[in-house]
Amino acid sequence: MEKVVLIICLTASFFSAFPQNSPTERQLIESTIQNYFDGWATGDSTKVSKAMHASCHLKNYNNGKFIEFTKNQYIGLFKPHARPANLSTRIVSIDITNNMGSAKIEISTAKDLFTDYFNLMKTNEGWFIADKVSTRTPHKIFDVNAIRLEKETILEGLKRPWSIVFISEDEVLISEKEGDLVKVNLLNKEKTKIKGFPTDLEDSLGGFGDNTGKFEVLLDPDFKTNKFIYLSYAAKAATKGRTTKIIRAVLENQSLQQIKVLFVAEPHTHERVHYGGGMLFGNDGKLYFTIGERLFTEKDEPSIPIAQNIEDKRGKIYRINSDGTIPNDNPYFGDKATPGLYAIGIRAAQGLTLEINTSKIWFSEHGTHQGDEINVLKAGGNYGWPMKTTGKYRFAEFAPKPILGNTYTEPVWSWLQTVAPTGLHFYVGQEFAAWNHNLLVGGLSKGSLWRLTIENETIKSTEELFVNDRLRIRKVVQSPMGKLYILSDELNGKLIRVKNGAL
């Protein structure tokens, strides 16, 4: 009996030695709302009921008439049915204070857009919808031919901006590759430099051939509560050269405080290209980021190419927890693999984006001579570089020796011409309703903006926009209210709103 007790105690101690990742309050609220979405979409009254507190009341005002339902009256309206193919859902915003919260959600059907505002509360049993108000807006009928693209410059004077994130509809953070991290009020154009950036930042030498500087700025999913932001940049180390570094900081009083280093893509090298630096939070709450291979030409590849070497941090995509620890469910690449690996075979990926209706992550990849790609991120995927490319090698004599047993993930799209794709974004909104769930991709080479229509993981069509008004585009984003913006990569960089002049 003593042996049995000892084994149990040791087993319990073993498992307790590994930290268990608890869901955040935001993730718990998202789970509650997902129950509501799933029940609403399929008529499952049990799931709708699970999301709502017993005291929940539901209200709307329609055609001059006030309507109110109790929880039981509301769930009594649901009858089981198949999920409509053209139904989509999204959480627009969540705000949390202690055990209270509010959320705005949207449910889009073939004919209508339903917008609900939830008040939520946390009890001993979890988060519940305490009450909701709702409205219904019929979709306007749009045709691609009814779209008239227009540009409106909102902000200029940016020093090769690399990334933008919205704190609110009218306030943004912008990282300038050759300048500062700035907070900007889009209404009065007031620009404030964020102080406290790490002193190991390697400055750009200027010019299109130097990728060095500041890269992505990203808000924590719980930013309103914890004030965490994440930054990627080129960091220097004495005579060793430079590399990509990922940090987390608290944004307080226009300053970076409590800086924590999450990742350093060692080794440092003297090259000034292909840092990667794209970052994204997935729907799983994990931080994904890209690290470039850091070579300009293939002739400098070692015997085991950098992007194929699981012991080398370069040329990879990573998945980590927001505090820098490694998730237990990451793919296994081998005992010697660098921690946090999620995918390998990456050359110079910069853009990451989340497909809202599927939770898939898509990314853009730069080829060496043509070979620019769009990929879907797969756990454990090997995207082939430099063993294979859809383009050509810059060093024509390069012939990589095959690696026995390797299999490679094919891109979902590649261009015949050089595009240099950067920040990409799935559009969801009403201003360009015909573009819903289309992928918008900015390009640096020759200045381009692309619209790709998608079915599952297949590109069905492509359209190049603004062909007579080209601009080096670094980022495509939407504001919290759905306005579409592009960020231009110029010495006089601009934040430009893309508008539909037909409305």
State the predicted function of each range.
Residues 100, 140-293, 351-354, 359-363, ...:
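Acidic, Gly/Ser/Thr-rich repeat motifs that build Ca2+-stabilized beta-propeller blades
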Residues 346, 458-480:
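Conserved blade-ending motifs and adjacent loop-strand segments that build the rim/top face
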Residues 203-208, 212-214, 224, 293-463, ...:
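Beta-propeller domain segments
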Residues 131, 152-155, 191-199, 255-264, ...:
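Beta-propeller fold detector
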Residues 24-26, 57, 61-62, 67-113:
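Surface-exposed, charged secondary-structure patches
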